[in-house]
From Swiss-Prot:
GO terms for molecular function: 4 iron, 4 sulfur cluster binding; iron ion binding; NADH dehydrogenase (ubiquinone) activity; NADH:ubiquinone reductase (non-electrogenic) activity; quinone binding. The lineage of its organism: Bacteria, Pseudomonadati, Pseudomonadota, Gammaproteobacteria, Enterobacterales. The keyword Iron-sulfur applies. Belongs to the complex I 20 kDa subunit family. InterPro entries: NADH_UbQ_OxRdtase-like_20kDa, NADH_UQ_OxRdtase_20Kd_su. Keywords: 4Fe-4S, Cell inner membrane, Cell membrane, Iron, Iron-sulfur, Membrane, Metal-binding, NAD, Quinone, Translocase, Transport, Ubiquinone. It comes from the Bacteria. This is NADH-quinone oxidoreductase subunit B. NDH-1 shuttles electrons from NADH, via FMN and iron-sulfur (Fe-S) centers, to quinones in the respiratory chain. The immediate electron acceptor for the enzyme in this species is believed to be ubiquinone. Couples the redox reaction to proton translocation (for every two electrons transferred, four hydrogen ions are translocated across the cytoplasmic membrane), and thus conserves the redox energy in a proton gradient.
Length: 224
């Protein structure tokens, strides 16, 4: 079977994976509120209820690429108990999964397979890039490793580390839940490209910058 690797052009328009849909300048429901306070508030409440159900029942697709996958499945143990976030139901089929975790090194031969699995997932769907190798190729700056999975599929949350700890994976789940809670997706039964509106997500460095600068008393190295 022949595979073709579709590379995303950040500066161009791609009907298959539109990067411009990842950003939004304003919430489209604000206009509804101004036109009709009652219907606008009702639509806000309806979106909140739907998003609450989506973010608290995230089913991951069960596949791994390398060592980061071991850290991912460690979060399913009783010590961490990822079931608190509604993400303990591993799916063996991409058609039944809500989000994909690209955990580990993505080789060039594996990239078209990942892309096909992503295409088989049903909307709404999200992607978490776990580990330095999945984020940017890591220490493998060679011809056989893709330098970041966002070269061919859209990524919602990045997890740094080599490999990241299970706590980092759980934090990524909480960030994804926060992002899903602010999404505005069509509530129609019609299946198709109707536009998805997402709030701009700040990086953890920007979000925690003020808190880190305000710290005056640093902990000793044996406490970190």
């Amino acid at each position: 079977m022949d595979y073709t690797l579709t590379r995303i052009d950040p500066n161009g328009e791609n009907d298959r994976y539109p990067l411009q849909s990842q950003e939004i300048v304003s919430d489209p429901l604000d206009a509804h509120v101004h036109r009709s306070v009652y219907m606008g508030k009702l639509e806000h409440a309806l979106h909140d209820v739907v998003n609450w159900g989506r973010k608290n029942s995230l089913w991951p697709y069960n596949f791994g690429l390398s060592c980061c996958y071991v850290e991912m499945v460690t979060s399913f143990t009783a010590v961490h108990d990822v079931a608190r976030f509604g993400s303990e139901v591993l799916r063996a089929s991409p058609r039944q999964a809500d989000f994909m975790v690209v955990a580990g090194t993505c080789f060039t031969k594996m990239a078209p397979v990942i892309q096909r699995l992503y295409d088989q997932m049903l909307e709404p769907k999200w992607v978490i890039s776990m580990g330095a190798c999945a984020n940017s190729g890591g220490m493998y700056d060679i011809y056989s490793v893709v330098q970041g999975v966002d070269k061919f599929i859209p990524v919602d949350v990045y997890i740094p580390g080599c490999p990241p700890r299970p706590e980092a994976y759980m934090q990524a789940l909480m960030l994804l839940q926060e992002s899903i809670g602010k999404e505005r997706r069509p509530l129609s039964w019609v299946v198709g490209d109707q536009g998805v509106y997402r709030a701009n997500m700040q990086s953890e460095r920007e979000r925690k910058h003020g808190e880190r600068i305000a710290v005056k008393n640093l902990r000793t190295p044996d406490e970190i």
